[in-house]
Design a protein with these regions (language model features):
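Non-catalytic, usually N-terminal nucleic-acid engagement modules in DNA/RNA processing proteins
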Residues: 1-189, 302-305
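C-terminal helical cap(s) of enzyme catalytic domains, especially alpha/beta-barrels
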Residues: 69-75, 285-299, 352-355, 364
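Structural signal for hydrophobic packing residues in well-ordered secondary-structure cores
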Residues: 137, 168, 172-175, 179, ...
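Glycine- and acidic
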Residues: 149-153, 158, 222-228, 337-340
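Glycine-rich phosphate/ribose-binding loops and adjacent secondary-structure elements
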Residues: 165, 178, 182, 194-311
Length: 364
C-alpha cells in the first residue's frame, strides 16, 4: 500500500493520525513548508530535518519551467535531486497557471499559458500535469483543477466546479495508467505516488458540498479543499471549510491548501483538517516579520535595536536559543543574507510547534 491513514484519536471533530507514505510517516495534523523551486527559501535541507519537518511541498509549475521535470526524472526524481529523504507533496500547477491572468487561455483540454520567465508558450492539461508530477516522483500528487477567483458569481463558480470534476476524472485515469513510471529506486518496489482530488465551488457552500460528494465517488486516497485564501474574509474561509469537511470521508486525509496564519492553522486543525501549507512563514520572514507567542513582531522596528531578548521567550527553537532581537534587527537593516535564514528558521519552527501542540492537545 502506498498510503495508509491510521486514525489514533479524535477530540470533537479534530483528528490525530499518522499518514504512512512511500518516503516516510507524517504525524497529523501537519503543517507543510513550501519548497517552491525544490527549496524552502533560505533553509537548507539538513536544518529542515532538524526542525522536524515531515513533509514539504514542491511546485509543479515552477519545476516544469526550471530546471524541467525530465531533467529531474533523469537525476532520480525530486527527492534525490534536492537531497530530501522525507515525504513530498506537489501541487498540480493549476493555481499558478490561473494566477497568470492575461498570460493564459483556458479550453476544455487545458490551459495555454506563457512563462513568466521568458514569455515562451506552454500548455498544461490534466494529463500533462500528471506526467510532470510523476516525473518529479512526489509521494502525493494533486489533480489538475481550475482555481476559482474571488469574487466569482454563482455561474462562474458552477462552471469552474464542472471543469474541475471533468479534469479530476481525466487526472485519475491518466495517473492510474502511468503512476508506476515514478523515478524511485528498487527499494520502493510495489509503491507508487498517491493522487488527491481537489474540491472547488467558489464561496458557495452547496456547490462545495456537491463537488466534494462527486469527487468522493471517484474514490481518491485523499482530498483537498482548494480555492481558499484568495482574498475572501477569514470568516468565509472558516465557513467553507466547516461546510465541506462533513462531506469528505472520515477515514482519508483532508488537506486545506494555502492557509494561513498560525492561529488559523490551529483552528482548522481543531475543525478536523489534517494537512495545511502556506508560504506565509517563509515570505514574512524575508520581510522581517516574525510570528511569536505574543503575536507578530516586525523585527525591523527601531525599538528592538538594543533588545537582548530572544525573538520569543516561549520558543525553544535554534534561533531563540542563541540570538537576540537586536542581532536579528541588525541583520535586516544591514541586508545580510543571514537575516532571511534565521527569521525563516524561527517562523517555520513556530508553525511546526503550533501543530505539535495541537496534536498533543488532541491526544490529551
Amino acid at each position: 500500500m502506498s498510503l495508509d491513514f491510521q486514525l489514533h484519536k479524535t477530540s470533537g471533530p479534530a483528528r490525530r493520525a499518522t499518514l504512512l507514505l512511500p518516503h516516510g510517516q507524517v504525524e497529523t495534523p501537519v503543517f507543510m513548508p513550501v519548497g517552491t523551486a525544490a527549496s524552502v527559501k533560505a533553509v537548507p535541507q539538513n536544518l529542515l530535518e532538524a526542525l522536524d519537518a515531515q513533509i514539504i511541498l514542491g511546485n509543479t509549475y515552477h519545476l516544469y519551467l526550471r530546471p524541467g521535470h525530465e531533467l529531474i526524472r533523469n537525476l532520480g526524481g525530486l527527492h534525490r535531486f534536492m537531497s530530501w529523504p522525507r515525504a513530498i507533496l506537489t501541487d498540480s500547477g493549476g493555481f499558478q497557471v490561473f494566477s497568470l491572468n492575461e498570460l493564459r487561455k483556458v479550453t476544455e483540454n487545458g490551459v495555454e499559458f506563457r512563462s513568466h520567465l521568458d514569455g515562451s508558450s506552454h500548455f498544461f492539461s490534466p494529463e500533462h500535469s500528471m506526467d510532470v508530477q510523476i516525473a518529479l516522483g512526489s509521494d502525493i500528487v494533486m489533480a489538475f483543477d481550475e482555481c476559482t477567483e474571488y469574487p466569482a458569481d454563482r455561474a462562474r463558480a458552477r462552471h469552474s466546479l464542472e471543469t474541475t470534476l471533468r479534469w479530476a476524472d481525466r487526472s485519475r485515469q491518466h495517473f492510474d495508467a502511468h503512476k508506476h513510471e515514478r523515478p524511485w529506486g528498487p527499494e520502493f518496489a510495489g509503491q507508487t505516488p498517491n493522487l488527491f482530488g481537489i474540491v472547488q465551488g467558489g464561496m458557495y457552500s452547496d456547490l462545495r458540498r456537491e463537488c466534494a460528494e462527486r469527487l468522493v465517488e471517484m474514490d481518491f486516497p485523499g482530498y483537498a479543499i482548494g480555492g481558499l485564501s484568495v482574498g475572501e474574509p477569514r470568516e468565509l474561509t472558516c465557513e467553507i471549510i466547516a461546510e465541506t469537511l462533513p462531506h469528505l470521508p472520515a477515514d482519508k486525509p483532508r488537506y486545506v491548501m494555502g492557509v494561513g496564519y498560525p492561529d488559523e492553522i490551529a483552528e482548522y486543525a481543531r475543525m478536523g483538517v489534517d494537512m495545511m501549507d502556506c508560504v506565509l512563514p517563509t515570505r514574512a520572514a524575508r520581510h522581517g516579520l516574525l510570528f511569536t507567542s505574543e503575536g507578530r513582531v516586525n523585527i525591523k522596528n527601531r525599538k528592538y535595536a538594543a533588545d537582548q531578548n530572544p525573538p520569543d521567550l516561549a520558543c525553544s527553537c535554534m534561533v531563540c536559543g542563541r540570538y537576540s532581537r537586536a542581532y536579528l534587527r541588525h541583520l535586516m537593516t544591514a541586508q545580510e543574507p543571514l537575516a532571511a535564514v534565521l527569521n525563516t528558521l524561527h517562523n517555520l519552527a513556530f508553525y511546526l510547534d503550533t501543530m505539535r501542540r495541537v496534536r498533543e492537545e488532541i491526544e490529551a
